[in-house]
A protein has these predicted regions:
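Specificity-determining recognition surfaces
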Residues: 21-22
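DNA polymerase processivity clamps
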Residues: 1-15, 28-142
Length: 142
């Protein structure tokens, strides 16, 4: 199929076969909380500014707080963000800080739901007031 306007032309083709069942990635996870998008985004930006290296951010989630930290040879940054709902289990998980920041910027809401399962499983972030949701894959932390 060809889609054309005065400014551009897009050519596409139908891919044969079954499309990946991405809905299975968004299953309900056992650990869920709600957090202020602005507070988490601001904390992530401050943490990322402290290091020039590509370092993972470590989330330490317990009770009603999310501790985030970035550590490299010259930086040891820690900050705590309050959760709006207690989380039932403690969890430590790492993420690419840049990806978390870009993901949070894509949302247009005040609060986000965060769902987790384990340090090796993705985090699901969903808008509190819409159906928009995304997955952020974890990275290994030391």
């Amino acid at each position: 199929a060809i889609f054309a306007t005065d400014d551009f032309e897009i050519c596409t083709r139908l891919v044969q076969g079954e499309y990946y069942k991405y809905q299975n990635m968004f299953k309900e996870l056992p650990l869920h909380t709600v957090i202020s998008r602005k507070e988490l985004l601001d904390a992530m930006v401050r943490a990322k500014m402290c290091t020039a290296e590509k370092c993972p951010v470590k989330f330490e989630i317990a009770g009603s707080q999310l501790g985030l930290s970035i550590k490299d040879q010259t930086t040891d940054y820690h900050e705590t963000v309050d959760l709006q709902e207690n989380i039932s289990e403690e969890l430590t998980i790492g993420f690419d800080a840049r990806l978390v920041i870009e993901t949070l910027k894509a949302f247009d809401c005040d609060n986000e739901g965060i769902s987790l399962q384990s340090p090796k499983m993705p985090m699901i972030i969903e808008a509190e007031d819409s159906d928009f949701k995304t997955i952020v894959l974890p990275v290994a932390i030391k």
